[in-house]
Protein backbone atom coordinates (compact mmCIF):
# COMPACT_ATOMS: atom_id res chain seq x y z
CA UNK A 1 0.00 0.00 0.00
CA UNK A 2 1.31 3.44 -0.93
CA UNK A 3 1.99 5.98 1.80
CA UNK A 4 -0.71 8.55 2.47
CA UNK A 5 -0.34 12.30 2.20
CA UNK A 6 -0.13 12.54 5.99
CA UNK A 7 2.56 9.85 6.20
CA UNK A 8 4.68 11.53 3.52
CA UNK A 9 4.30 14.94 5.14
CA UNK A 10 5.11 13.54 8.58
CA UNK A 11 8.33 11.95 7.27
CA UNK A 12 9.31 15.21 5.54
CA UNK A 13 8.68 17.33 8.63
CA UNK A 14 10.49 14.84 10.87
CA UNK A 15 13.45 14.98 8.49
CA UNK A 16 13.50 18.80 8.67
CA UNK A 17 13.32 18.66 12.49
CA UNK A 18 16.28 16.27 12.60
CA UNK A 19 18.21 18.35 10.08
CA UNK A 20 17.78 21.40 12.33
CA UNK A 21 19.54 19.54 15.15
CA UNK A 22 22.62 19.37 12.91
CA UNK A 23 23.46 15.92 14.20
CA UNK A 24 24.88 14.03 11.21
CA UNK A 25 23.75 10.60 12.42
CA UNK A 26 20.18 11.82 13.03
CA UNK A 27 19.98 13.41 9.59
CA UNK A 28 21.50 10.39 7.87
CA UNK A 29 19.07 8.05 9.65
CA UNK A 30 16.26 9.56 7.55
CA UNK A 31 18.09 8.94 4.26
CA UNK A 32 17.74 5.61 2.48
CA UNK A 33 21.01 3.75 1.77
CA UNK A 34 20.81 4.77 -1.89
CA UNK A 35 19.70 8.36 -1.23
CA UNK A 36 21.04 11.09 -3.49
CA UNK A 37 21.40 14.73 -2.47
CA UNK A 38 21.32 17.56 -4.96
CA UNK A 39 22.11 21.19 -4.10
CA UNK A 40 21.23 24.12 -6.33
CA UNK A 41 21.84 26.61 -7.79
CA UNK A 42 25.09 25.30 -9.21
CA UNK A 43 26.68 28.73 -8.65
CA UNK A 44 27.03 27.76 -4.98
CA UNK A 45 29.80 25.40 -5.99
CA UNK A 46 28.33 22.26 -4.43
CA UNK A 47 28.73 18.96 -6.27
CA UNK A 48 25.63 18.44 -8.43
CA UNK A 49 24.99 15.04 -6.89
CA UNK A 50 26.15 13.49 -3.63
CA UNK A 51 25.52 10.12 -2.07
CA UNK A 52 24.44 9.68 1.52
CA UNK A 53 28.00 8.86 2.55
CA UNK A 54 29.52 11.80 0.64
CA UNK A 55 27.16 14.22 2.38
CA UNK A 56 28.15 13.16 5.90
CA UNK A 57 31.12 15.57 6.05
CA UNK A 58 28.87 18.47 4.98
CA UNK A 59 26.47 17.76 7.84
CA UNK A 60 29.37 17.58 10.32
CA UNK A 61 30.71 20.91 9.05
CA UNK A 62 27.34 22.55 9.67
CA UNK A 63 27.25 21.23 13.23
CA UNK A 64 30.72 22.63 13.93
CA UNK A 65 29.81 26.05 12.53
CA UNK A 66 26.27 26.76 13.79
CA UNK A 67 24.44 26.93 17.08
CA UNK A 68 20.81 27.84 17.81
CA UNK A 69 20.02 26.62 14.30
CA UNK A 70 16.36 26.43 13.29
CA UNK A 71 14.59 25.14 10.21
CA UNK A 72 10.85 25.40 9.74
CA UNK A 73 8.23 25.64 7.06
CA UNK A 74 7.84 29.31 6.17
CA UNK A 75 4.66 30.90 7.48
CA UNK A 76 1.94 30.79 4.84
CA UNK A 77 3.84 28.30 2.68
CA UNK A 78 1.59 25.27 2.37
CA UNK A 79 3.56 22.06 1.72
CA UNK A 80 2.89 20.39 -1.63
CA UNK A 81 2.47 16.62 -1.48
CA UNK A 82 2.39 14.43 -4.59
CA UNK A 83 1.22 11.06 -3.28
CA UNK A 84 1.72 8.96 -6.46
CA UNK A 85 5.30 10.26 -6.86
CA UNK A 86 5.90 10.13 -3.06
CA UNK A 87 7.26 13.70 -3.16
CA UNK A 88 6.93 16.57 -0.72
CA UNK A 89 7.90 20.16 -1.55
CA UNK A 90 8.60 22.52 1.35
CA UNK A 91 9.48 26.22 1.51
CA UNK A 92 11.88 26.35 4.47
CA UNK A 93 13.25 29.20 6.58
CA UNK A 94 16.65 28.67 8.13
CA UNK A 95 17.97 30.76 11.02
CA UNK A 96 20.84 30.42 13.38
CA UNK A 97 23.93 31.85 14.96
CA UNK A 98 27.32 31.01 13.50
CA UNK A 99 30.97 31.77 13.96
CA UNK A 100 30.49 34.82 11.71
CA UNK A 101 27.17 36.11 13.07
CA UNK A 102 23.47 35.66 12.51
CA UNK A 103 22.37 33.58 9.52
CA UNK A 104 18.93 33.77 7.92
CA UNK A 105 17.98 32.23 4.60
CA UNK A 106 15.34 30.31 2.68
CA UNK A 107 15.34 26.97 0.92
CA UNK A 108 13.08 24.91 -1.26
CA UNK A 109 13.28 21.22 -0.35
CA UNK A 110 11.94 18.55 -2.68
CA UNK A 111 11.96 15.23 -0.88
CA UNK A 112 11.13 11.96 -2.59
CA UNK A 113 10.39 9.15 -0.16
CA UNK A 114 10.91 5.41 -0.41
CA UNK A 115 7.98 3.11 -1.24
CA UNK A 116 6.99 2.90 2.43
CA UNK A 117 7.14 6.69 2.84
CA UNK A 118 9.49 6.38 5.81
CA UNK A 119 12.85 7.49 4.39
CA UNK A 120 14.14 10.08 1.94
CA UNK A 121 15.39 8.61 -1.35
CA UNK A 122 16.17 11.87 -3.13
CA UNK A 123 16.84 15.22 -1.45
CA UNK A 124 16.81 18.24 -3.76
CA UNK A 125 17.76 21.51 -2.02
CA UNK A 126 17.54 24.90 -3.68
CA UNK A 127 19.17 27.62 -1.54
CA UNK A 128 18.84 31.39 -1.58
CA UNK A 129 22.01 32.19 -3.50
CA UNK A 130 22.13 35.93 -2.66
CA UNK A 131 22.19 35.16 1.05
CA UNK A 132 24.68 32.36 0.59
CA UNK A 133 27.00 34.59 -1.47
CA UNK A 134 26.99 37.37 1.14
CA UNK A 135 27.43 34.91 3.96
CA UNK A 136 30.23 33.11 2.11
CA UNK A 137 32.18 36.38 2.01
CA UNK A 138 31.81 36.69 5.80
CA UNK A 139 33.12 33.17 6.24
CA UNK A 140 36.07 33.83 3.96
CA UNK A 141 36.94 37.05 5.83
CA UNK A 142 36.63 35.28 9.19
CA UNK A 143 39.02 32.50 8.27
CA UNK A 144 41.43 34.84 6.44
CA UNK A 145 41.70 36.96 9.58
CA UNK A 146 42.54 33.87 11.64
CA UNK A 147 45.45 32.92 9.36
Swiss-Prot record:
- Pathway(s) it belongs to: Secondary metabolite biosynthesis; terpenoid biosynthesis
Give me the disulphide-bonded residues: none
Query: Which InterPro entries does the record cross-reference, listed alphabetically?
Result: Fungal_Meroterpenoid_Isomerase, NTF2-like_dom_sf
Please list the GO biological process terms of this entry. Answer: terpenoid biosynthetic process
Q: What family does the entry list? A: Belongs to the trt14 isomerase family.
| The protein's role, per its UniProt record | Part of the gene cluster B that mediates the biosynthesis of the fungal meroterpenoid acetoxydehydroaustin. The first step of the pathway is the synthesis of 3,5-dimethylorsellinic acid by the polyketide synthase ausA. 3,5-dimethylorsellinic acid is then prenylated by the polyprenyl transferase ausN. Further epoxidation by the FAD-dependent monooxygenase ausM and cyclization by the probable terpene cyclase ausL lead to the formation of protoaustinoid A.
Miscellaneous note, as given in the UniProt record, is: In A.calidoustus, the austinoid gene cluster lies on a contiguous DNA region, while clusters from E.nidulans and P.brasilianum are split in their respective genomes. Genetic rearrangements provoked variability among the clusters and E.nidulans produces the least number of austionoid derivatives with the end products austinol and dehydroaustinol, while P.brasilianum can produce until acetoxydehydroaustin, and A.calidoustus produces the highest number of identified derivatives.
Describe the protein's quaternary organization and the partners it interacts with: Homodimer.
UniProt-recorded name of the protein = Austinoid biosynthesis clusters protein H
Amino acid sequence: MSPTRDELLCTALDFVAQFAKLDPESVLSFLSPSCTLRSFPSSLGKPPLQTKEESKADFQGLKDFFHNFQLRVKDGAEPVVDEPARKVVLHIEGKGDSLVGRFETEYIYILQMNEEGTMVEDFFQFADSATRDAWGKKIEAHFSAKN
